[in-house]
Amino acid sequence: GNISIPEYVKAFVSNTPVQGITPLQVAAYILKYSDIALTWAGKQSLANSHELRITIDDIKTMAWLGKYYAHKIKAATYLAIFRETLQKEWQNKTIDELNASAGYWRHYATIGLSNNHNPLWTNRVGYVDWKENFQWATYEVTSNGGKLNMPSMRPTPGGTILEAENTV
């Protein structure tokens, strides 16, 4: 089964082997399959069908969300290691992952906003406000002692660049 972040950190700090799937392995799996989905979606021809374009955009949206969560898992793991060891390198890794995570939220929201209303009602969590959540994603970087340094983002067809909408 999966190993929790606290269990993993305890084993990591004490240099003890663990049985199961670590949080970093979970993140790697999510990133792998997100990349596969994005590569596949990028090869599809969207010229003939509006419905197909929306479906492909949904696949891309979920892949970007996967990348967001994968980097959040890595950030949470590194932050827990930092809190146990107080070694600055783990705080730096945390900030790097939070910046990556915020950047992927931006990609997720860009495609999501191009096809959906904001905020969007979802059955599981209620309303999701993509712009507000982007602000939270950037706050996570600064509240952990980092500076915003998100990956560059190219505009997508029909997409919205969130910075242009005064969300940062």
Which residues does each PLM region occupy?
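Extracytoplasmic
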Residues: G146-V168
